[in-house]
Amino acid sequence: MTGEKEKVPAKHGWIHDNPYLLLALAALFWSGNHIVGRAIGGEVPPIGISTVRWLLPTIALGLFAFPHIKSDWPVIRTHWGILLWLGIVGGALFTAGQYIGLQYTTALNVSVLNSLVPVLIIATGGIIFHDRVTPVQLCGILISSIGVLVIIAQGQLSNLQHLRFNWGDIIIVSNMMVFAVYAVYLRKRPPMHWMSFIFVFGAVSALTTLPFMLWEMAAGITFKPTWLTVFAVVYVCIFPSVLAFAAWNRGVQLIGANRSGPFVHLVPLYTAIFGSVLLNEHLSTFHIFGFALIIAGV
C-alpha cells in the first residue's frame, strides 16, 4: 500500500471521471499562463497578479457556490489545518513564485526546469509518504523528459551547453519543489465539493499574499491599465486558477500524484504549439519528434 490515491467517489460524468483529459487540460491552461506571464512582465506586479488571480475567483465562487460551501462548512471547520496548508503552499507560494520567477528567467529555462516536476513529485512522495514507484512510471518519466530536452535543445545536444541559468531559475526550481509538495499532500484533501475546495483554497491564497500586494502598491509598483493587462487578469482568474486547479486536483484524486506528474511535460509542448499559432514561431522536425516522445511518456 502506497497511500498514493485517495478513495474516489461515485462517477459524476465522463469529463469529471477522465483523469487523463483533466490533467491534459490543466497543463493546457498552465501553459497559457506562462505565455501571459511573460507577455505582461513589467506591466503588472508579480504579487499583485498573484493576489488578484485568486481574489476575484474566490468572490465569484462565494456568490455562485454558496449552497455547496454551506453544506461543506462542517468539513471545512474540521479540516481547516490541511486546507490552510494546501492554500498557502499550492496557492500563495506557488502562484507568487511563478510570476516572480518569470520576471527574471527565460521561457527556455522554465521549460527545462518544468521537466523536474515529475521527479520531484516522486521524490517528495517517497520522503513524506514512503510511496513506491513502478518501473513503468519511471520509464514514462524518462521518455517524456527526453522529449522535453529534444525540444529545448532543438534536436542538437550541443545546444544544451549554451543554456545559462540565473538566480531567477533558483526561484523556479524552488517553486517546482513547492508544487511537488502540494501535489503529494492533495491526498489529504477532505471530501467536499470542488467549488467549496477552490473557494477555501483561493481565499487562503489571496489573504496570504494580500499584505505583500499592499506593500507593492505602497512602493509604487502597480498595475498599468492596458487592454493586455485586462485580458491577462481575466485569463489568469479563470483558466490557470479555477479550471486548471480543479482539473489537476480531480486528476490526482483519480490516479495519484506519481502518475499525474508526467502530464506537466505537456506544458512545454502546448507552449511551443501556442508559439507557432499565436506568435508565428516555426515548428521544426525536432518539435514533432519531441512531442511524440512526450506523448509516449505521458
What are these regions (language model features)?
Residues 29, 33-34, 62-114, 150, ...:
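Specific transmembrane alpha-helical segments of multi-pass solute transporters/efflux pumps
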Residues 35, 61, 121-123, 127, ...:
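Transmembrane alpha-helical segments that form core, pore/gating elements
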Residues 2-51, 88, 161-188, 208:
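Glycine-/small-residue-enriched transmembrane alpha-helix faces in small-molecule transporters
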Residues 2, 42-93, 120-121, 177-182, ...:
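Transmembrane alpha-helices of multi-pass small-molecule transport proteins
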Residues 61, 84, 124, 133-155, ...:
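Hydrophobic transmembrane alpha-helices of multi-pass small-molecule transport proteins
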Residues 50-52, 91, 95, 109-116, ...:
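Helix-helix packing/entry segments at the starts of transmembrane helices
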Residues 36-39, 43, 57-76, 146-162, ...:
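Membrane-interface helix-cap regions at the ends of transmembrane helices
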